[in-house]
């Protein structure tokens, strides 16, 4: 298994304007499901064949959060979201790349640029492939959501040994009535329950960042305490 590690220089934090960030990367050519799972449990995130985690000098606001699937019960409002999507077609498949995907990705990020002042990047086919398709091996999938045969949401996930790692989700803002972002996560939870998996790894919760603070609303959940290397056996998550 070829592995190359490197770090970025300090840069402006994408989540907190008054902070600086530094990222550690691992490039793993052919990552196994087991190694992926062990990295995710230790606070890493996968994009393509790259794994990353923050190693910021003066900040520890990025907290890895996971939902406890076996204890999770849908609320009344979440059941309403499911009912609104009774005719939404959901397909679980390996990651795809098409004009439809790229158009939807761009439309979502243009909307977020206007709504939340996100910094927008124009992704080429190759860049999308490198981030969301490459390296899916035997664990990477996408949940594709269709309304009247139109692709309206894509949720990229890894199905691992003890849970589902939620990588990235984007949707058509014209279909806001269907709460597609929330519906996609509820689908992840349903899949995990059916597969007897314990966790949904939601990535980083940042309390002071509106785009990431919502994750704490999904309870019960646990937060990773500290950072651990692969060779360290003790990984502590706490409610």
From Swiss-Prot:
Subcellular localization(s) per the UniProt record: Cytoplasm
InterPro entries: Acyl_CoA_acyltransferase (IPR016181), Asp_Glu_LeuTrfase (IPR017138), N-end_Aminoacyl_Trfase (IPR030700), N-end_Aminoacyl_Trfase_C (IPR007472), N-end_Aminoacyl_Trfase_N (IPR007471)
Catalyzed chemical reaction(s): N-terminal L-glutamyl-[protein] + L-leucyl-tRNA(Leu) = N-terminal L-leucyl-L-glutamyl-[protein] + tRNA(Leu) + H(+); N-terminal L-aspartyl-[protein] + L-leucyl-tRNA(Leu) = N-terminal L-leucyl-L-aspartyl-[protein] + tRNA(Leu) + H(+)
Gene Ontology cellular component annotations, sorted alphabetically: cytoplasm
Record's keyword terms, sorted: Acyltransferase, Cytoplasm, Transferase
EC number(s) from the headed UniProt entry: 2.3.2.29
Annotated GO biological process: ubiquitin-dependent protein catabolic process via the N-end rule pathway
Keyword Flavoprotein: no
Chief localization: cytoplasm
UniProt family annotation: Belongs to the R-transferase family. Bpt subfamily.
Function of the protein: Functions in the N-end rule pathway of protein degradation where it conjugates Leu from its aminoacyl-tRNA to the N-termini of proteins containing an N-terminal aspartate or glutamate.
Record-given protein name: Aspartate/glutamate leucyltransferase
């Amino acid at each position: 298994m070829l592995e190359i590690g490197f770090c970025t220089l300090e840069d402006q934090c994408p989540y907190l304007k008054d902070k600086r960030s530094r990222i550690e990367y691992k490039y793993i050519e052919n990552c196994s499901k087991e190694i992926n799972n062990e990295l995710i449990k230790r606070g890493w995130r996968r994009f393509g064949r790259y794994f990353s985690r923050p190693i910021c000098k003066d900040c520890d606001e990025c907290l890895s959060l996971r939902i406890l699937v076996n204890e999770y019960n849908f609320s009344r409002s979440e059941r309403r979201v499911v009912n609104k999507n009774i005719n939404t077609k959901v397909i679980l498949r390996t990651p795809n790349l098409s004009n439809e995907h790229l158009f939807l990705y761009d439309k979502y990020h243009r909307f977020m640029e206007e709504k939340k002042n996100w910094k927008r990047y124009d992704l080429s086919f190759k860049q999308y492939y490198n981030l969301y398709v490459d390296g899916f091996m035997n664990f990477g999938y996408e949940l594709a959501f269709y309304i009247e045969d139109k692709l309206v949401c894509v949720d990229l996930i890894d199905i691992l040994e003890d849970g589902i790692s939620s990588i990235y989700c984007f949707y058509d803002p014209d279909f806001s009535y269907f709460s597609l972002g929330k519906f996609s996560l509820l689908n992840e939870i349903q899949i995990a329950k059916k597969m007897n998996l314990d966790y949904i790894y939601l990535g980083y919760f940042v309390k002071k960042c509106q785009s990431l603070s919502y994750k704490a609303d999904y309870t019960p959940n646990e937060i990773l305490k500290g950072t651990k290397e692969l060779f360290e056996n003790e990984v502590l998550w706490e409610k």
